Amino acid sequence: MAMNSTLFLEIKNEYTEHLVDVLTPYIYEGLLAIYSRACEIADESKKSNKILSIFQKLLQSIDEWNQSRIDDETNRIKMTGQTQEYLDDLVKAVIRSNIILLSCNNNISQAICQNFYNGLSTSALIHRCYAECGKDAHNNPYLFFHGVEPLDYKRNQVIIQDHVRMGITRAIRKILPISMILKEYLVNSMNLFPDPNRTNPLFPAQSINNAINNPFQLPSPMQMPGQPTQIVQPVQAVQSMQQFQPFQIEQPMGSQMMGFGTNITAPETKNQIEQEIFNVIKSENVGQNPQKIKAIMNIEKIITSAEPNQIADFAAKTTSARDPMNLPQANPIGFQNNQFNQQKKLYQHPQHNQYNQIGSQGQNRDYRQNNSNHSNNSNHSNHVDRTDRTNQSTYTNQTNLTNQSNRSNYSNNKNYYNSKSRTGDYSEINKNSKQGHFEQSQNYSKDTESMFITPANGQNKLGTGGNIDLEKIDFNNINLIEDYGVKHSHE
């Protein structure tokens, strides 16, 4: 076939679809006319329940139509669809395309065309279409029944039109001269595969053979215009590599010079940094907050180039200077989230969320004791206020005690009942004291005695006791809070 088979198949399908679209609505109208005739016959014979049976008998008579009735139906389709000019040619084009496609030979014999075209007419195809569509209607007569809901009736119309389209396609296939096509297909020789001796003008055989027999050869090395390529021999390349000398490092590279070129390990630089940091840390009042921030930023610019180990060592020195007990801190250098220029540092109470003050003498210790007395059995020490009660409570050196109607009010806003206390005088902690002296006030009850050891300025504001001689105090029996934990001593 000179024409592409795929393209020819598309042409055949387009012609066939066009013919089906033209004939489908008018074939459907013809079938409805046959159903209407069946309803009239049922009304005349007073057999309304036999409408579908009468309709099936009329469909069976389609094959017996005379030529005049077939011609009348053909003329009706041409005139109604306004296809009288090309309907005959469209039918011949559909038949011819099917014959050529099925025979796989465009040069079909003239005998088949002449004999078939002389006997083929449009009326014959339309008659065959009615016969095939009548068979589908005979098998499904209820689709034409009018005594149903409008929705069901419309659905039945769509189904009938689909059956008509399939019936027209079958009619075209059955009207083809299939016997003559098979003979032409079987008798005539067909070249399904191309002849190897036949040359293609686009790809000559000589060029194809040369490409197969001759291996692919790379072209000569590309050369730039006016700059010929120089091929270096391996021996010359090795000799040229020997000219390079190893790089001599005169001074070992390390972390001595970093950042902005400041030698952080120089003694004068270290002394300068330490002096500035200590001035900022130890100063009580440097100035306003912007001045403090500016001073810190100047220090930060100097030590940005320092190594982590050097910063850690330097931070340890500054931390030990500020904190004699060397407590753990979140930021040793103190650039962020730390309070500068304060000799008193606040530590959060682990239980009551309060704060204790650390004096300037480095006595950052919190004296406290957790005492419990069950059934007048109490644990006491030199700094414990012992009271008779039924519940266990914790006392600290920051608690302000009062006695109102034999009830004690503590700093955690809880009232404890003291049934045997005879005195209401207690000592109050002086939080603003910076002295290193201690004051002891003794309050006696019937069964117990209480004694507080609090940092004070030497005066007892609320208590009845006087000054205490520090030499008489047993400091070994006092429990201290270390590493944020409470240790208890029981006598």
Swiss-Prot record:
InterPro entries in UniProt: DUF5764
Record's keyword terms, sorted: Virion
Location of region: Disordered: 355-444
Source organism superkingdom: Viruses
Pfam families cross-referenced by the UniProt entry: DUF5764
Disulfide bridge partners, by residue number: none
Primary location group: virion
Cellular component, GO, one term: virion component
Annotated compartments: Virion
Feature: compositional bias, Polar residues: 355-364, 390-404, 429-444
Biased amino acid composition, Low complexity: 370-381, 405-421
Name this protein carries in UniProt: Uncharacterized protein L417
Lineage start: Viruses, Varidnaviria, Bamfordvirae, Nucleocytoviricota, Megaviricetes
